[in-house]
Amino acid sequence: MIELATMSSLCPDWNLSEIIDGMKCHGYKGLEPRVEWGHACGIEADLSGDERRAIRRQMEGEGLDICCIATGVRMAEVDREKRAEHVEDLKRYIDLAADLGCGLVRTFGGQRDRDREWQYVVDYVVEGYAQVVDWAEERGVVILMETHDDWCSSPPVRAVVEQVGHAHLKILWDFMHTQRVLERPGESFSIFAEHVAHLHAHDGQYVDGKMQVGALGEGVIDHQTPLQLLGKMGFAGYFSVEVIHKVGAGGGAEGVMAQYANAFRRMLASI
């Protein structure tokens, strides 16, 4: 079954209790906190053990999940010393996820070395993930590599996951980003569907040559087709709304949360 989740990026000024109220009002099951951005929910790697236990109790008491920890970790970071820092950061986020009862941690490939061929870059990224997948397995957490930035195209992402060859590295399929590089949903699905463990959702329109995020089902990004394909294969995971509002910008979160929930339910009903 495909469940509905929201990222804290949608409502960065809401504390955890406010997020829970919004989730329950609009039928969301999962929360995906975006760490490192100072969101009011306060979910970060520096939480104490007591704070982690309290958050977990609060979510579980409401029948809700922390479904994924969204990090800014980048495994294609060209500078090896900086990449080593990303690896250590990822270990801390895996520990955070485990303590919160969360089974997924999102990472990026990030900007690749443009002077190198793809196979070299894939090998380099594989080397990074290989340093941490056993750590993730020990803690019962799956690392996700998102189709994002230099890694919007499906084949390189699949290549990384298959070369690592570990059950605790999977793919986060962001429907928008694969389509932005002109892949049809069916093409992406055929390339890596068996490795997909989490989904990101945000619709939009091209305005002056740039993507402007908007209401689900009213833009140019096809969410219906990939949901249908995944549903037929028995995918069980989260469709996580990634509409990003800046901290302190105010307004908009409640309406976006409601609109995406209603559109998502209409899409599921037609599958």
Label the predicted regions.
Residues S8, T71-V73, G109, I143-T147, ...:
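Short glycine-centered, acidic/aromatic-flanked micro-motifs in structured strand/loop junctions
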